[in-house]
């Protein structure tokens, strides 16, 4: 391990002990915000510190086994050599694990997200596919114990959605779903197709981290046009009786957001403003990512909505992620919400890219 990394890890151990002590301090416990921030920091540092301590222990085990191997007794030497081989293997594994744990963290990974799905080419079939995708993400969210809150929906004439926007909240939502942004393509025989021909349709998916209040983009009220209209969504007897739905247009950028799911105009307005702040922040993030991509092409992290990232082929029961050449013949499971089969390989590929970058920087 490089001395610079070891020095950084030793500083982390000191900080870990400091945070641990602070979490027992009565004044910190009384301050909910500070206690929450320190608890989050403790949870982030703990696995790194534990791994580093185990790695240092493995070095001590190597030294002890090396000394023991010098013993004149043949049985003792044999036992020491076995322990030495085991300790070295353990040390290498822990070294690799530490490198992974030391990779730069995306500060957005822990955030909630706004998920936007829009039907693209393919008319009614694209809208039906948008519905399938939303159901897939909803079922996956259920498995992860995330909350799903629909903010706006525009239903297709024959089912599904022309557009649907939802907020997903829970542990690590953005870190899990951030590689879902892009164009998703479906190949299947529509129910209305009498000739049995396979049609190709597409939807675009955008996953945006929810902007924190502290870092939200400042929005000048003079830059906004706010329109009210009658909700067209579900709601039984309350639908269309009041202009509770909100549409906000950000005049400098032309970005338009809507929220119509609440009966209260104030709640719809607050949610629409939150979505607008995230859209504006995401536009800035995309600009930065584009700039970074010019210097280093990332396979999985570009987040370009126009980029075709995945194909769902129903006749063959196949899902293909084009960025990492991943092909799975388990379409039914994936579309039913078993997204880990796709998400985990994408995260591993991204991790491998970061490790390669780290290795290049250390050369």
UniProtKB/Swiss-Prot annotation:
> In this entry, which stretches build a coiled coil?
none
List the InterPro entries hit by this protein, alphabetically: PCRF, Pep_chain_release_fac_I, Pep_chain_release_fac_I_sf, Prokaryotic/Mito_RF, RF-1
Alphabetical UniProt keywords: Cytoplasm, Methylation, Protein biosynthesis
Where is this chain's protein located in or outside the cell?
Cytoplasm
Q: Name one GO molecular function term.
A: translation release factor activity, codon specific
Please tell me whether the keyword Cytoplasm is annotated for this protein: yes
Write down any Gene Ontology CC term.
Answer: cytoplasm
Q: PANTHER family in the record, alphabetically?
A: LD18447P
The record's HAMAP family line, in alphabetical order, gives: Rel_fac_1
Can you say what this protein is called?
Peptide chain release factor 1
């Amino acid at each position: 391990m490089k001395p610079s990394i070891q020095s950084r890890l030793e500083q982390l151990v000191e900080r870990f002990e400091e945070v641990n002590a602070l979490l027992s301090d009565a004044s910190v416990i009384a301050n909910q915000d500070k206690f929450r921030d320190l608890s989050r920091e403790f949870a982030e540092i703990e696995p790194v510190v534990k791994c580093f301590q185990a790695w240092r222990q493995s070095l001590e085990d190597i030294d002890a086994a090396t000394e023991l191997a010098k013993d004149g007794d043949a049985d003792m030497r044999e036992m020491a050599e076995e322990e030495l081989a085991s300790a070295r293997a353990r040390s290498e594994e822990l070294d690799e694990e530490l490198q992974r744990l030391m990779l730069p963290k995306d500060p957005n990974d822990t955030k909630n997200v706004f998920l936007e799905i829009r039907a693209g080419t393919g008319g009614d079939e694209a809208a039906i596919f948008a519905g399938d995708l939303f159901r897939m993400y909803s079922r996956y969210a259920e498995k992860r114990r995330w909350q799903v809150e629909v903010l706006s929906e525009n239903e297709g004439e024959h089912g599904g959605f022309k557009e649907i926007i939802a907020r997903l909240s829970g542990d690590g939502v953005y870190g899990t779903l951030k590689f879902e942004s892009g164009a998703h393509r479906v190949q299947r025989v529509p129910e209305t197709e009498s000739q049995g021909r396979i049609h190709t349709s597409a939807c675009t998916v955008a996953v945006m981290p929810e902007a924190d209040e502290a870092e939200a983009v400042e929005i000048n009220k003079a830059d906004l046009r706010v329109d009210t209209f009658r909700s067209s969504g579900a709601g039984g007897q309350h639908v269309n009786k009041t202009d509770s739905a909100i549409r906000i247009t950000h005049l400098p950028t032309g970005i338009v957001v809507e929220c119509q799911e609440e009966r209260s105009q104030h709640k719809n307005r607050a949610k629409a403003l939150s979505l607008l702040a995230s859209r504006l922040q995401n536009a800035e993030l995309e600009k930065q990512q584009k700039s970074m991509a010019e210097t280093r092409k990332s396979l999985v992290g570009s987040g370009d909505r126009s980029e075709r990232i995945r194909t769902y082929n129903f006749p063959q029961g196949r899902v293909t992620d084009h960025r990492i050449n991943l092909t799975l013949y388990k379409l039914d499971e994936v579309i039913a919400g078993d997204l880990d089969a796709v998400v985990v390989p994408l995260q591993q590929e991204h991790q491998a890219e970061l490790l390669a970058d780290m290795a290049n920087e250390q050369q």
